[in-house]
Amino acid sequence: MTAEPEVRTLREVVLDQLGTAESRAYKMWLPPLTNPVPLNELIARDRRQPLRFALGIMDEPRRHLQDVWGVDVSGAGGNIGIGGAPQTGKSTLLQTMVMSAAATHSPRNVQFYCIDLGGGGLIYLENLPHVGGVANRSEPDKVNRVVAEMQAVMRQRETTFKEHRVGSIGMYRQLRDDPSQPVASDPYGDVFLIIDGWPGFVGEFPDLEGQVQDLAAQGLAFGVHVIISTPRWTELKSRVRDYLGTKIEFRLGDVNETQIDRITREIPANRPGRAVSMEKHHLMIGVPRFDGVHSADNLVEAITAGVTQIASQHTEQAPPVRVLPERIHLHELDPNPPGPESDYRTRWEIPIGLRETDLTPAHCHMHTNPHLLIFGAAKSGKTTIAHAIARAICARNSPQQVRFMLADYRSGLLDAVPDTHLLGAGAINRNSASLDEAVQALAVNLKKRLPPTDLTTAQLRSRSWWSGFDVVLLVDDWHMIVGAAGGMPPMAPLAPLLPAAADIGLHIIVTCQMSQAYKATMDKFVGAAFGSGAPTMFLSGEKQEFPSSEFKVKRRPPGQAFLVSPDGKEVIQAPYIEPPEEVFAAPPSAG
């Protein structure tokens, strides 16, 4: 039995033949920008070039074209501002940008340092070899260090450009790629500071706003870029906003705030990822995934897989963000102190902490500014710091060069000063009667050192009219001493001598409870030292405990201080020294 031949109508035959034609009818309308394109497809379709990052699809209706869109950060557009209402896709754009750069550049050429005060999405990029660190609002010290590192890179580049006569960042990039050039040793390429959530940044870190402005204004010339996202453009002051040469705008809460064009009102609501470019064209930002899926579903898993994929292709790593240690021992801060054979100036350069700005030691110049004040709440580290600084002074000076007198009512400074470095009589005072007697005797001896009126400048500088050791009066818990004085001003005999302290070899180191510190700066003794510009450490405390228009006291981890000195204001981690071992008496034997 034979099969019957298929019967087809003329219409069916003609339609089949037309469907195989090579030329097709002109499509009047391109498909709407609905679904995001994955990053692997964007990169495959993009025109690759250095410092260009593929970010999405741009619709150009006049050219009847939908093509890959990206940013070129090699020139004036290297700083980027991203504006848009909440949940419009700003953080996803930042993820896409970093992943796009990481997929097309080496960790030697681009590095990212992120401050995430938005939705927390940047933390998923932390394991990229191109990311030197991600800090959030729960890590204020790290936030400060991220900005400080960027400033340090810019300052170092500025010095390098001058030293090696580099005329532009473009020339620097070429020289850095040449292994025979000195600048090839620079571990940083083009570095990007990303701040996701600008209002939160200026609200919680107001002191850093000016530093970010400096980076935005000067950084591009040295390969340092700033990328900022904000829900409202008005949150960005003009002195920052004007330096953001590239702007990307999502749907705004108020279209009148647009920095590009009012066509942003045409962005559909509830369509995350839709934006407008500087060219005034509509965009669909891509998704940071490499699995070919045109969706933002399960994005965390896709990002994690992409990060792992990129990390497996590189052995280099962006320089990590260095942070202040929770504790720095004195022997780490001051491993090789100069000895007694050094000159006076060297011996009285005393290390008092590690700077947050560049992680180098901060010093108290006690040869010219002989005093040090330490204010802080209970358990903030006041006594430990005083102990460590006393040890640093003793390491530099022999007993013939310095002697200590202690006011130590709580016996917190046991073993802080070796017996050889203590004054002979009245060296350790644990009550008011003992202290008053010792201070009066000390004042009598120091008055003999006051300079005669006919000394020359050279004689004043060399202190040739007297000989002997400097005296350090180390006072722990000033507030307790004041309370025990019964209304009498403690240290009154020494107060008139403080203006001449540098001339007569007198140094005072005072610790005080933060709640009493402001009051202490008003008295004739501590107040005289504070008023003369003595370096002052503000450890942990409450803002209202020390009102000031120049800085804000706040809670800090033990040993961390805000240092106010003639050199400026900065955060330091003060030195730590192990407390003396407690010796317990053996229990009496039975019988």
UniProtKB/Swiss-Prot annotation:
Gene Ontology CC: cytoplasm; peptidoglycan-based cell wall; plasma membrane
Residues of the FtsK domain: 65-259, 359-545
Entry keyword set: ATP-binding, Cytoplasm, Nucleotide-binding, Repeat
Biological process terms in GO annotation: biological process involved in interaction with host; protein secretion by the type VII secretion system; symbiont-mediated evasion of host immune response
Effect after changing residue 382 to T: Cells unable to export EsxB
Extra facts: In ESX-1 cluster, the FtsK/SpoIIIE-like protein is split in two genes.
Free-text function comment from the UniProt entry: Part of the ESX-1 specialized secretion system, which delivers several virulence factors to host cells during infection, including the key virulence factors EsxA (ESAT-6) and EsxB (CFP-10). EccCb1 may link the cytosolic components of the system with the membrane components.
Protein name: ESX-1 secretion system protein EccCb1
Organism: Mycobacterium tuberculosis (strain ATCC 25618 / H37Rv)
Gene name in the database record: eccCb1
